[in-house]
């Protein structure tokens, strides 16, 4: 299992939201490139970037900050938020992003995901955000009636590289990850699942490691790293058996 530091971008700055609410944001760094370098230096093996403005607007909004991050690090990067067409996917891959995360479009235009997987094999990840097991879309603003496990199986059939599963009620609240829901999703498919939302401390990482055999290959953490309740070096050491 790998620990994946998150950089959420709003108006060109690194922020964290509580439960996906744009008005409940805390700014942690005005320099996204410097923040990315810091996570790499502390042992991060993959960077998770979210264009929050893009997620809510449905179009890219933080291209300069994203370029700065891609140029600042040598580790792989993945990016989501407002990516809803093939030209945007291609533009971000050409910008230096290693893999693109599709969220809302996976539910609303699944054929685009199928085509993206065909054109860019190994570089398409689907983010499934859920509340009470139901898929949420459009920056978490709308909760649908589709089960997260059902959508995950569809995406697996398209050939996505991985599924990022976020429990919205846990995200940014530091209440611990939803192990049961994450395990259930991972066991329903054969593609790797990355857990997201709620990690607050080293113990939460240890708990997630107990469901690694279900197919949970990584964990994304943001707020816990920024507030200091989780140390990235310690988390990486734990997952590598060196803690």
From Swiss-Prot:
Cellular compartments per GO CC: cytoplasm
Keyword annotations from UniProtKB, A to Z: Amino-acid biosynthesis, Cytoplasm, Histidine biosynthesis, Isomerase
One of the record's GO molecular function terms: 1-(5-phosphoribosyl)-5-[(5-phosphoribosylamino)methylideneamino]imidazole-4-carboxamide isomerase activity
Pfam families on file: His_biosynth
The enzyme's E.C. designation: 5.3.1.16
Coiled coil start-end: none
Compartmental location: Cytoplasm
Catalysed reactions listed for this entry: 1-(5-phospho-beta-D-ribosyl)-5-[(5-phospho-beta-D-ribosylamino)methylideneamino]imidazole-4-carboxamide = 5-[(5-phospho-1-deoxy-D-ribulos-1-ylimino)methylamino]-1-(5-phospho-beta-D-ribosyl)imidazole-4-carboxamide
Pathway(s) this gene product operates in, as recorded in its UniProt entry: Amino-acid biosynthesis; L-histidine biosynthesis; L-histidine from 5-phospho-alpha-D-ribose 1-diphosphate: step 4/9
InterPro entries reported in the protein's UniProt record: Aldolase_TIM, His_biosynth, HisA_bact_arch, Isoase_HisA-like, Isoase_HisA-like_bact, RibuloseP-bd_barrel
GO biological process terms, semicolon-separated: L-histidine biosynthetic process; L-tryptophan biosynthetic process
Active site: 8, 129
Annotated family: Belongs to the HisA/HisF family.
HAMAP family xref list: HisA
Name the UniProt record assigns to this protein: 1-(5-phosphoribosyl)-5-[(5-phosphoribosylamino)methylideneamino] imidazole-4-carboxamide isomerase
Organism: Syntrophotalea carbinolica (strain DSM 2380 / NBRC 103641 / GraBd1) (Pelobacter carbinolicus)
Taxon lineage: Bacteria, Pseudomonadati, Thermodesulfobacteriota, Desulfuromonadia, Desulfuromonadales
